[in-house]
């Protein structure tokens, strides 16, 4: 009886160790997949490929960038991205400094920094921006990761307001 109990204990310990190792392997694989997704996303922006850029978002994603209202849904994001990639001056690079995957394995987030150059539609001057971002990802049924929330904050102060002609 004691021998059977000892065998059961060893088998249980080995099973738990295997499960723990598998969880760690899955977590590491998910982190690498999210990192690879962001690397590909930067390449898609460099190629100015609207379809590939938008494919990184879920259908119900939200994009929040400085100076504009939140953009909700893939169709609205596509419209914004189309305008961006039409700009010959567009150059966007971003790099995650942190990637974290939830223990549940279905959500992840990245935070990092970005640099952006584009043409100001009003002044026609090139704007150089830099700042931080946080992107929340949801794991898809096919195992890929797509952004559900993409939030950008600029480190560049807004232009100084000019006094109005009414003196207010």
Model features per residue range: what roles?
Residues 1-9:
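Bacterial N-terminal signal peptides that target proteins for export
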Residues 12-13:
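Repetitive helical segments and hydrophobic/amphipathic motifs
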């Amino acid at each position: 009886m004691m021998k059977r109990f000892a065998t059961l204990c060893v088998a249980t310990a080995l099973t738990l160790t295997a499960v723990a190792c598998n969880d760690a392997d899955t977590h590491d694989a998910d982190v690498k997949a999210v990192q690879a997704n962001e690397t590909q996303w930067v390449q898609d922006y460099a190629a100015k490929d609207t379809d590939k850029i938008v494919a990184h978002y879920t259908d119900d994603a939200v994009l929040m960038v400085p100076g504009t209202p939140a953009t909700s849904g893939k169709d609205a994001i596509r419209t914004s991205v189309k305008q961006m990639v039409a700009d010959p001056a567009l150059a966007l690079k971003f790099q995650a400094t942190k990637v974290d995957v939830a223990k549940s394995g279905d959500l992840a987030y990245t935070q990092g920094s970005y640099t952006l150059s584009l043409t100001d539609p009003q002044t026609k001057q090139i704007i150089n921006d830099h700042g931080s971002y946080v992107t929340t990802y949801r794991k898809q049924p096919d195992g890929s990761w797509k952004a559900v929330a993409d939030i950008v904050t600029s480190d560049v102060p807004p232009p100084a307001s000019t006094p109005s002609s009414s003196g207010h």
